[in-house]
């Protein structure tokens, strides 16, 4: 795992972006997309690069997916809580809320993490893998989240796939949104295109929504 501070500000929310291994200038390109959409930088954005995506972001093993989904998300969350967050010195910045954000399987991880720890004021899940076996059932079985800010977005064409599990993503995402809306500040946004369309812009829209809170 590698950690990169992409945007740094002395005030506003601190956003942890859990991401896949970047390629070329991808980090800078995404940061530029965020700056272009958000404008004045009143937030800090920290990227946490996960090398083995399926292994370290899947919350549990399942017979319905291949063995690369090893269910070791807990190790990643431990690393974030024990190694990354202490370096941010959150306690000395008490009025700066901490958010976690991710795309695809990292989006699933971000929401799952909300049920594991209370350190986050909210999360953003962009094109999150809500199709993951057992996740809707997991959310239903957990104590209800309350007073959190949660941003969820999905591509309008993402469920148009021959993959049996992934084809359920729109229905499962909507079901999870409806559950969360009862006690939290939740926005659900549908974007044009499929899973990989304009990922940088989708993340930028999530950051803009988080940044608007100012606390």
Residue ranges and their predicted role:
Residues 17-21, 127, 154:
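The conserved beta1-alpha1 loop
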Residues 34-35, 114, 177:
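A conserved amphipathic alpha-helix that caps or lines the catalytic cleft of carbohydrate-
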Residues 130-210:
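The feature captures the conserved acid-bearing segment of alpha/beta-hydrolase catalytic domains
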Residues 101-106, 110:
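Gly/Ala-rich beta-loop-alpha elbow adjacent to hydrolase catalytic centers
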Residues 97-102, 126:
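Short beta-strand immediately N-terminal to the catalytic nucleophile in serine-hydrolase-like folds
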Residues 112-122:
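Conserved hydrolase catalytic core segment
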Residues 48-52, 128, 193:
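Active-site loop/turn elements of alpha/beta-hydrolase fold enzymes
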Residues 7-91:
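Serine-hydrolase catalytic machinery in alpha/beta-hydrolase-like enzymes
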